[in-house]
Amino acid sequence: MEQNSYVIIDETGIHARPATMLVQTASKFDSDIQLEYNGKKVNLKSIMGVMSLGVGKDAEITIYADGSDESDAIQAISDVLSKEGLTK
């Protein structure tokens, strides 16, 4: 299992467009990928799960990946978070 933590810097947090990009990216991998915020974990392959967390600015999130392609999954998700302006 691999994990990485991030602080969200976008003024509106994880809103619909970047959430969609995260879900699409996570769905490309076989690994089980979870997003944790405020003690609650959701499947990062579920748009409803991601949006239900209401992740705002300055929130600390952790991404967990467990499976055969976990390293690639964490890297790809990190790239999306950065590209979408959610993290530095």
From Swiss-Prot:
One GO term (biological process): phosphoenolpyruvate-dependent sugar phosphotransferase system
Entry keyword Phosphoprotein: yes
Positions bearing Phosphoserine: S46
Activity control: Phosphorylation on Ser-46 inhibits the phosphoryl transfer from enzyme I to HPr.
Residue ranges of every copy of the HPr domain listed in the record: 1-88
Origin: domain of life: Bacteria
Active-site residues annotated for this sequence: H15 (pros-phosphohistidine intermediate)
Location (main, coarse): cytoplasm
Protein known as: Phosphocarrier protein HPr
